[in-house]
Swiss-Prot record:
Binding site for Zn(2+): 127, 130, 145, 148
Enzyme type, top EC level: ligase
Cellular location(s): Cytoplasm
Gene for this chain: metG
The family this protein is said to belong to: Belongs to the class-I aminoacyl-tRNA synthetase family. MetG type 2A subfamily.
Cofactor remark from the record: Binds 1 zinc ion per subunit.
Entry keyword annotation includes Cell inner membrane: no
Protein name: Methionine--tRNA ligase
Pfam family, one: Anticodon_3
Sequence motif 'HIGH' region, residues: 12-22
Job of this protein: Is required not only for elongation of protein synthesis but also for the initiation of all mRNA translation through initiator tRNA(fMet) aminoacylation.
UniProt motif ('KMSKS' region) ranges: 298-302
Single GO BP term: methionyl-tRNA aminoacylation
Amino acid sequence: MKKNFFVSTPIYYVNGDPHVGSAYTTIAADVINRYNKAMGMDTHFVTGLDEHGQKVEQAAKQNGFTPQAWTDKMTPNFKNMWAALDIKYDDFIRTTEDRHKKAVKRILDIVNAKGDIYKGEYEGKYCVSCETFFPENQLNGSNKCPDCGKDLTVLKEESYFFKMSKYADALLKHIDEHPDFILPHSRRNEVISFIKQGLQDLSISRNTFSWGIPIDFAPGHITYVWFDALTNYITSAGFENDENKFDKFWNNSRVVHLIGKDIIRFHAIIWPCMLLSAGIKLPDSIVAHGWWTSEGEKMSKSRGNVVNPYDEIKKYGVDAFRYYLLREANFGTDGDYSTKGIIGRLNSDLANDLGNLLNRTLGMYKKYFNGTIVSSSTVEPIDDEIKSMFNDVVKDVEKYMYLFEFSRALETIWKFISRLNKYIDETMPWTLAKNEAKKARLAAVMNILCEGLYKIAFLIAPYMPESAQKISNQLGIDKDITNLKFDDIKEWSIFKEGHKLGEASPIFPRIEIEKEEIVETKKELKIENPVDIKEFNKIEIKVVEILDVDKVEGADKLLKFKVFDGEFERQIISGLAKFYPDFKKLISEKVLAVVNLKFTKLKGEISQGMLLTTEDKNGVSLIKIDKTVEAGAIVS
């Protein structure tokens, strides 16, 4: 494993304000960066702003500023938001900086010297907002931008072109040989399909406006914004400015770009082709996340449903907001932001599960030992089970974090929290406290809980640094928990004899949801085909999370579901293809399944259960469960 780690967000358009989508990407980058630091790696985390282009020039003019003054004015909007979200980046890059201009000029010179740039003329439909030309084969006769929906402009101008088509085969080969180059793998297939349609050469210059980086070998031309913007990653790593830094954080790092799925084409096609031409190492992984809706609807200013991160952290706290975004949706799929969802997570996961574990532990230690650690050498099998489970949790978290499965990593940590809560019920400290001969055993139990809580605080620190530190402080340890490494917490002897624990104080206060009036209509009850309760109890129904969905080969009606039932991944075949043509949208949904049916084979595929559905005049629908309910929850 490489010892260095480089992670980036996209650089955001300076014209806009940060929103829940950009906050999501940047929080994710912050979390993965903090995690890799805890793994003992040297890390570099860069975010920043894309400050060139026609629309920046136009916005500056409309507001009475020069382009540079306009970008200077807009920059604090992003820096202040990231500070409010407790994001600790190593570099905030602006494309107007001299170091970046130097890097862009250098990569252009390298690519040009290789013979991969030529002069031509471009005529096509252009989106000013997205600063992108679109060939007719992407428009299907429309004059609307396929990305933002705005009207396209027919533009004809002299331009310099990059021979991107030359690198199509080399890029396909690289993607094939590096399975994790594009994540999730569904995006990988999308990119491969696009490349196989035939790559066109890329227009990389403009001469109809002036706000950009001049091209030395093309007087009167400035660099096309994407060729400019994408280079920011190597600029930050030290390209053409700090050779040692570049060697460390690009050539000898695991290099990861976190992006939204709308810009996957630029990052997974244009950027790698540029690097192939320049002879520079390609990134190790390009990870594209989904979009967020709000209360089930697309966010838009006209609807008034855009989620403002400032409002959310004011209501729920910064850590609850960070936790919810990364727990609620798998990183590669779309997510829905809802008031009910975040309150449910805060009350259930944070206040009930974690908060109660901390309060119970500290309360009992104060009651039984006056809040002072008493050492004990008594060990029972259940203690070893807890320690063994923690080791497994660390391994699973490492596996999920490597693949950017933030939600699965958090779910794994919460299983350990649940296990410690159950450990209290199993060991019954209140009963041990009544017997003086059991005081040593009581101390051993309480110490397991304190040690476990400190380890939990360490594991959640990348996600919730402020709350993790509060837990540490309440356990009587004031050192900065975000600076610890995994080696610092692997032993179960952190708390020494005489150590004084702190005072318990609620970290996650519960939020009450206003109860809606429930109107019941009484009808005469008739039961047809009654089932004996003993027979019904034989059926085991669980909440399962849909991990992936595909069509069954050779069967138009069948879908193959990969689900997680809280313990195991299983495959279930269901005849739902007709009712879910966009079946990939089902990924990350929680549904109900019968999990103790005899396995059966359908069209050569093993089905290990049955998904429960409803049927009415509108068709057949899966029974979807609130995402706050854990996979594996039993329906009874």
